[in-house]
Amino acid sequence: MTHFNLFTLNRILLILCLLLVSNSYSQDKEKDTILKPKWKVNGRLAFIFNQSSFSNWASGGQNTLAGNINLNYDFNYKKENINWDTRIITGYGISYVSEQGYRKTDDRFELNTLLGLKTSTNWFLSFIGNFKTQYTKGFDYKQEPKSMVSGFLAPAYLTFGPGMLFKKSDELSLNIAPATARYTFVNDFFSGKFGVEEGKNTAFSLGFNLSGYYKFSIMKNIEMENIITMYSDYLANIGNVDLDYQTNIRFKVNSHIKMHITFHTIIDDNSSSKIQFRQLFGLGVNYNFHEKRTF
């Protein structure tokens, strides 16, 4: 009887232990599932400076001072088959040249959002949205007197449409949108420019849009970021392709100091018949906030 009771008691204790372990594992698994982060947020603020000064310099020269402030903010959402990426890119820069005064060197606000529904490995049904403009007036100083070539929300571009997304990682993606709508907005002063008919403030186009992103490390402490957008209007000259391509190279000195090189090329017949090119080189103070923060 004693052996039977001990045997029975041992079996009961064993079963209870197994149940407790199983329940604990289930709770941990459920907890991991519930607490698994869906959002990943990353922000980067950079101040870029360059300066030169001359005093009694035999070969001559002009005192210059320039500064840029850039803010990039990424919001990435992932849950099961849903992928939603949103990126804010904004920057403003001015330069001071003796005898010329202050001039704008950079002025940009761009909001990109891309929603994807996974269909297979690395492939998604997608819907893109893009809005870009500038903050302040821009001038062409080659003309006398200087002429205004842009203003606040003039022009402003709103682009959206369905497509297919290939996304291998947060560092490599390509979106193809064959039926993309684009609206161009201007104020009364720029009516008749940027593809908008005289007397109107908006223009509509429907076309093919391709956008890509690729970031990689060239070597330790050196990274290259490539952002490209191409657009062809079905309703106008389909052979004219608008191009916006930017390359950013960053050399990391330490956690807060980086060397920045930017090459930015724009081809857009509606704004200029010439190829637009911008280059920036400078030493920057960087601050990362919400770096790879998840919740």
Name what the model sees in each region.
Residues I249, F277-F295:
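Outer-membrane beta-barrel "beta-signal"
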